[in-house]
Amino acid sequence: MNMAIHKNQNGPDGKLFEGLIKRLAGSLHLYKQYFMIQLKSTMQYKTSFFLTALGQFLASFNVFLGMYFMFQRFRNVRAYGYGEVLLCCGILLMEFSLAETFARGFDQFSSIIGNGTFDRIMVRPRSSVLQVLGQRIEFTRLGRMVQAVIIFAYSLSVGTVDWSFSRIVVLIFMLLGGTALFAGIFLIYAAICFFTLEGLEFMNVLTDGAREYGKYPFDIYGKKILLFATFVVPYACVQYYPLLFVLGRGKWWYGLLPGAGVVFLLPCYLLWRVGVRHYKSTGS
């Protein structure tokens, strides 16, 4: 029996699984190297880093002030109180900040194509996606992340959410799903650059625009916007629906919808693969 088990482990399926594990471990190790290189490069100019991060923090702080003064005059927005809107805002800003920190390479992809860097990426025996991710890690966006954490923490003190284990888990799913969603949008932006060479400004509506109007629950904008944010670009699946679950107003399966943000990566990656196949070298 032991011989049979040993034989099964060395069969085609076992070797395939072992190969996948080794490949994943190799990719993680490579990304770790990229991460450390980018961190060391950033820390060469500590003053610039801290001032830029502080600027990111202060530039985003007007969001909190705007909400504070608005709720001083109006007690509710639709059916949402001050603490509930702050919770929504804090979560979305954390999602966007994480995506912008670690997926910044895709947002700068037009320059990667223009200066011929992608030619070098193509001839290396590693994932092109992983290499582009490692081209730029924007640590200065941590200033915005700190502000988002402060808003989130403050929302806990003024809100009325009855936190439970399931709601904490859904909150974590929201962060993961939202980060994946925004990373997917950056990936779409990069894929379009294969055909246009330059990035298209309208994509900012899906990134920076979503960051702005996603600070409030999507249902306040009307049914059409909610439908778009559910079935086209699933912002609502990582914000509105799971937020209802956390607030105790939604169905249990709303807590599963942040997974749509991860699933959204699949069509984004397929579009990327189409772009890679159509890529023509700059010749530089």
Model-derived regions, located:
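Hydrophobic transmembrane alpha-helices and immediately adjacent juxtamembrane helices
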Residues: 2-284
